[in-house]
Amino acid sequence: VEPLWTKKPADLKDEDYKSFYRHLFPMADEPLFWIHLNVDYPFNLTGILYFPKIKNNLDIQRNRIQLYCNQVFVTDAVEGIVPEFLTLLHGVIDSPDIPLNVSRSYLQSDANVKKISGYITKKVSDKLASIFKNDREEFEKKWDDIKIFIHYGMLSQDDYYDKAKQYFLLKDTDGKHYTLDEYAEKVKE
């Protein structure tokens, strides 16, 4: 059976992604959404990353992303490959371009690993921006579940902060959501 992450996103339906998630994480709630990674230049990377529904702080688990090399499982300790603020995501990444038997400090200095980490951050940011732009109401409904990723990313990575500030939300006491720019305008009034 061909692994789902090796297929083209256009050939897959939402149910395929959900079924694969249930296979990987049978006890987890349905994911909020997912990102299908598929790039072959300047490095090879395929995979599917899922945003899990996090019910409470006790539910936060790391090491839920499985690393494969040419469809052979390597590890679920992906620190250094996946940006730290995204290690709470669930899923699979597969790349022959990640050195396998090296120290964490070597990984952090490897050029391909840095590119892969940056690519994953960009894809996550693009997906969040797309949901925000195309269906803000749906984005606001998911905000309480995804804000931990966005907060942590904005605090830990300057380049992510610059991207995320466009869809970062604040909630007032009435439960209405505002972007930073909208909130600044409201305060001026």
Regions found by a protein language model. Give the residues of each.
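Conserved GHKL (Bergerat-fold) ATPase module
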Residues: 1-189
